[in-house]
Amino acid sequence: MRHSCLDAFNSYVARYDASDERIALKVEHTYEVAELCDEIARGEGLPPADVDLAWLCGLLHDIGRFEQLCQWGTFSDADSCSHAALGIQVLKDEMGSFTNDPEWVHIIESAVALHSDFRLPAGLSDREGLFCTITRDADKVDILRVFNQSSCDAVLGIDSSEFSRGEISDMAFEAFGERRCLARDERPGSLDGLVGAVCLAFELELPATRKALGDRGYLQALLREPFGLSPHFESELTQYRWNAICDVMQGLAFDSRPGIESEDPHKRLMNRLDCSEAELNSEAYVDGGIFLDSLLERYDA
């Protein structure tokens, strides 16, 4: 089954400009997410047929990206259309090349349609929710891979000197304290995209996903040396905030000890600081309107 699906996927992608690096990056992302879906499904103890279905959800989750790039020249949904919705349109013509099983078609369409939503909607069946969650979890893990393998300029739109002068906004730091992903309008600071990537780990829902991320070391590497740079910042407030973020993540990420999940994350975070933020001279934050532009171009993260 997988060989025929890979052949169908590669035949579909061959219609687009293979010399465009963005196509190659999206193909790589697709393969990575599909394999992560397989790994997560196996780790959660799903039967072989469901593991194959999870893998296929991963293979097709970004099928709309190629036509999006062809029509609009961008991977940014804000500057074109919803790539998830476009993927559903593509699959109306292409789904038969991958499966004709009505139940599989329904699950795949749900996973594709909802993989990039900020939250899953109420009303999904348990089975729909499971495959949507596997797909979303796998996508988040691979976004962290992208952060590890990309430059600061490519991801945040700032060079290394600007990185050292960067700011973490109140809004992003508060979202981190709440242990949740950042919405697109919660990223005004030049380093908020980096904080947003770290926050992806908070919303990995399945134990097998957290294990997959831990095994790959993407988060640890990002905390230790983001974009291959030393995380030393000119702003004292930024440095305190980054140190607090690192300390909390090292203490909480993938920690299964009883009581960890119930601890107030903001209290824990603030307890990590050597002094309160009120004692620091908080200046105006950098307007980071261009931060993450390149990442949005690739993944609309």
Question: Model-flagged regions — what are they?
Answer:
Residues 51-76, 87, 107-118, 301:
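His-Asp-centered metal-binding catalytic motifs of divalent-metal-dependent phosphohydrolases/nucleases
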Residues 45-56, 96-113, 127-134:
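Acidic/histidine metal-binding catalytic segments
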Residues 21-27, 31, 35, 39-47, ...:
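Divalent metal-dependent phosphate-bond-processing catalytic cores, especially two-metal-ion Mg2+/Mn2+ enzymes
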Residues 29, 52, 79-83, 130:
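Secondary-structure capping and boundary motifs in well-ordered enzyme cores
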Residues 32-40, 81-95:
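An active-site-proximal "capping" alpha-helix that borders the catalytic cofactor pocket
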